[in-house]
Curated annotation (Swiss-Prot):
Sequence segments annotated as region (Disordered): 32-61
SUPFAM superfamilies tied to this protein: HMG-box (SSF47095)
DNA-binding region: 62-130
Record-level Gene Ontology MF annotations: calmodulin binding; DNA-binding transcription activator activity, RNA polymerase II-specific; RNA polymerase II cis-regulatory region sequence-specific DNA binding
Organism: Sus scrofa (Pig)
Compositionally biased residues, Basic and acidic residues: 43-61
Protein name (database record): Sex-determining region Y protein
A biological process from GO: cell differentiation
The UniProt record lists the keyword Disulfide bond: no
Gene Ontology, cellular component aspect: cytoplasm; nuclear speck; nucleus
Pfam families assigned: HMG_box
Leader sequence segment: none
Alphabetized InterPro entries for the sequence: HMG_box_dom, HMG_box_dom_sf, SRY, SRY-related_HMG-box_TF-like
Tissue: Expressed in the genital ridge.
Length: 236
């Protein structure tokens, strides 16, 4: 199939008319008859099948019967919207909720009776109805590192022992990009240092540092630092 398509394409390019418009029309005509080019009809059919395979469509979904507050607020919402066109729907809902709470039981009773009547009609019309609330889409949670840091058991040190002064800066991570904002430096002085093997700044370090407190962090060390100073950025 690929060879036949290549030979057909070669014949198109060898045609007498070398104008770009003619060549483009020939290629498009060849692509329509070839199975190598997907058509829009297949994708549109897939879209219809996907939409049709949903749990419930908007027209088939049965609405819940109205409660007393909804029965009361229908006319009230319409009146408030006409009298105050500048008010938003959320503000109108808050105002209606406060006003509904201020009504007495005697004032609410007719609306409760109407709501019970509507529920009875709904049960007769849909005997097997079960309320199925729509699930809200789960919000994508920001991926955080498994831990803010890992146990710092090996660090790069020079051949001689130096007390380490770590400058810590917070890093705010957003997606795949991170912006570093420096906070107040925090000095952590190691009290006990034990060197097991020799190491240099370019090779793998085999030195183990034991301190009074455990330092947990990913340590992006920089080679151009002075022997006794290392900068650590903690993902925050």
């Amino acid at each position: 199939m690929v060879q036949s398509y290549a030979s057909a394409m070669f014949r198109v390019l060898k045609a007498d008319d070398y104008s770009p418009a003619a060549q483009q029309q020939n290629i498009l005509a060849l692509g329509k008859g070839s199975s190598l080019f997907p058509t829009d009809n297949h994708s549109s059919n897939d879209g219809r099948e996907t939409r049709g395979s949903g749990r419930e469509s908007g027209q088939d979904r049965v609405k819940r019967p109205m409660n007393a507050f909804i029965v009361w607020s229908r006319d009230q919402r319409r009146k408030v919207a006409l009298e105050n066109p500048q008010m938003q729907n959320s503000e109108i809902s808050k105002w209606l909720g406060c006003k509904w709470k201020m009504l007495t039981e005697a004032e609410k009773r007719p609306f409760f009776e109407e709501a019970q009547r509507l529920q009875a009609v709904h049960r007769d019309k849909y005997p097997g109805y079960k309320y199925r609330p729509r699930r809200k889409g789960e919000r994508a949670q920001n991926l955080l590192p498994a831990e803010a840091a890992v146990l710092c058991s090996q660090v790069r040190v020079e051949e001689r022992m130096y007390p380490f002064t770590y400058t810590v800066a917070k890093a705010k991570c957003s997606g795949t990009e991170s912006q570093l904002s420096h906070s107040q430096p925090m000095n952590i002085t190691s009290s006990l240092l034990q060197q097991e093997d020799r190491c240099n700044w370019t090779g793998l370090c085999h030195s183990r540092v034991t301190s009074t407190g455990q330092i947990r962090a990913d340590l992006p060390f920089h080679r151009g630092l002075q022997p006794g100073l290392s900068h650590i950025y903690f993902p925050y």
